[in-house]
A protein has these predicted regions:
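Mature, well-folded catalytic/scaffold domains that follow N-terminal targeting or propeptide regions
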Residues: 1-225
Length: 225
């Protein structure tokens, strides 16, 4: 997770990857990995203000009509304060339903390059222990990551899919590129309720990558035409 003293992946990605490796060797887990994971977690600073947003939400604000589009618009506009308020309203109105995680994941995938790997691992980490009291922590995790860079506009879907990833994979130069490709492939094969939206954004990203690499106007792999 550290490359030249600079983190190249989110802690959720790192710990989920370690969990996956250890899951294959439960009878004799690697002491090196266990030690690394323990030291890594110990070096992280816990977020301390996650609950404050919920505590500060006025009760009359929860009773108002709740529209998912208000949360989506706030995220799109990059208004951090409004995003927190709308997310809290949706979360409280839905009684802590994890559905909000998929809503935010679809938005984050408008930037597959920056968020694809993180979103896959974040959803998987929650699914490993899908407890209601953990939903808000994961909501904050996604919101804080999305805040790092502006979201592009929602994209139009294309006919591209995992079968068109070959040329992109062959051009990978950094480990983060492999993480992204593996993540979007797994997301494509998932069964999330917002999967159509996930596929729309992923197909657009694949199309753009292949346009750059093979010059086809529609972004398709000529071997699959």
């Amino acid at each position: 997770t550290i490359y030249n003293d600079t983190p190249i992946v989110h802690p959720v990605v790192c710990m989920n990857a370690i969990k996956n490796i250890l899951g294959d060797v439960r009878d004799s887990p690697s002491e090196i990995l266990l030690t690394y994971a323990g030291n890594y977690i110990a070096g992280l600073k816990p977020r301390e203000k996650d609950q404050k947003v919920l505590e500060d939400m006025p009760e009359d604000g929860i009773g108002l009509s709740i529209f998912i589009s208000d949360l989506e618009d706030a995220c799109q506009q990059g208004d951090a304060v409004q995003v927190q308020e709308e997310a809290a309203r949706v979360y409280l109105a839905a009684d802590g339903s994890p559905a909000i995680l998929e809503i935010l994941a679809e938005l984050a995938l408008q930037n597959v390059e920056g968020n694809g790997g993180f979103i896959f691992h974040c959803l998987r980490a929650f699914a490993f222990k899908p407890e209601k009291e953990r939903v808000w922590s994961f909501v904050q995790c996604i919101l804080q990551t999305m805040k790092n860079q502006p979201l592009p506009e929602p994209n139009e879907g294309t006919n591209n899919g995992p079968n068109d990833l070959g040329p992109i994979f062959l051009k990978c130069e950094q480990p983060i590129d492999w993480i992204t490709i593996a993540a979007i492939w797994r997301l494509w094969e998932s069964e999330y309720m917002r999967l159509p939206g996930f596929k729309r954004e992923i197909s657009h990203w694949i199309s753009n990558q292949n346009i750059t690499q093979n010059g086809n106007p529609d972004g398709s792999n000529p071997d699959n035409m």
